[in-house]
Structures are given as structure tokens and as C-alpha cells.
């Protein structure tokens, strides 16, 4: 069985866009976890590119990952992460991924190079770099 990671939206978009690092992410996807907030970011990006509702559901429907809901505890953690991540320019979605990774004790997988400098008690793995 593959090791388990928490996917940032950038990791999933990397696969969908066929970017560098997509193979690495694709190998981890069958055992990966993604938060509902990060999945919403991916849906938003696909819709902004002009995909229809049906096309988005077709693209995402067959992907093998475990979607986790956003909990109240995660919402608080997202807010509490703001001071430590503000200088890195992390969005609410970025912090949602990190909060889920912290809650589950799993590494967060991202394409966002800005995460490399984080020191918040969550293991960050960069897809490229």
C-alpha cells in the first residue's frame, strides 16, 4: 500500500494539468486524502477554465482519493495558522490543507514552493524541488 499524504489543491491540479511532478502525485493518489475546501478550490479552477458542471464531475469523479469534510476543529486551526503563515502568503485553502495534515499526522503534498520555509509542525513535501 502507498503511503498516505494530504493533497493540496496544487497537487491535484498538477495531475489534472499534466505538469512536472504529476506522476509522483498520481502514484500517491490511491491512498491520498484531500480536504473538501481544497477540492472546492480545484472545482473552482476547472469551472474558471470553462468546464461545465458535467465535465468537472467527469474529470474528478473517477479519481481515487478520500475527501474529508471541513470540521469545526480544523476551522479553528486554519485561523490559528494565519499569524505563522501570513509572511509566506498562504491562502485559507493552503491553511485548510495544513490543518487537515496536522489533525491526521500526515505530510502535506504541494506544488507551492512557498511552503518550503514553513515551521509549523507539519511535514511538507514539495512535488518539485
Across the structure, where does each feature detected by a protein language model lie?
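Short loop->beta-strand "edge-of-pocket" segments that line small-molecule binding or catalytic clefts
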Residues: 5, 31-34, 63-67, 107
Amino acid at each position: 500500500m502507498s503511503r498516505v499524504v494530504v493533497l493540496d489543491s496544487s497537487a491535484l491540479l498538477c495531475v489534472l494539468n499534466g505538469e512536472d511532478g504529476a506522476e509522483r502525485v498520481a502514484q500517491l493518489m490511491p491512498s491520498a486524502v484531500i480536504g473538501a475546501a481544497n477540492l472546492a478550490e480545484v472545482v473552482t479552477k476547472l469551472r474558471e477554465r470553462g468546464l461545465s458542471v458535467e465535465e468537472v464531475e467527469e474529470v474528478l469523479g473517477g479519481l481515487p482519493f478520500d475527501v474529508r469534510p471541513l470540521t469545526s476543529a480544523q476551522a479553528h486551526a486554519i485561523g490559528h495558522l494565519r499569524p505563522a503563515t501570513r509572511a509566506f502568503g498562504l491562502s485559507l485553502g493552503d491553511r485548510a490543507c495544513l490543518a487537515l495534515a496536522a489533525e491526521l499526522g500526515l505530510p502535506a503534498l504541494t506544488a507551492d514552493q512557498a511552503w518550503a520555509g514553513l515551521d509549523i509542525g507539519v511535514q511538507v513535501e514539495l512535488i518539485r524541488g
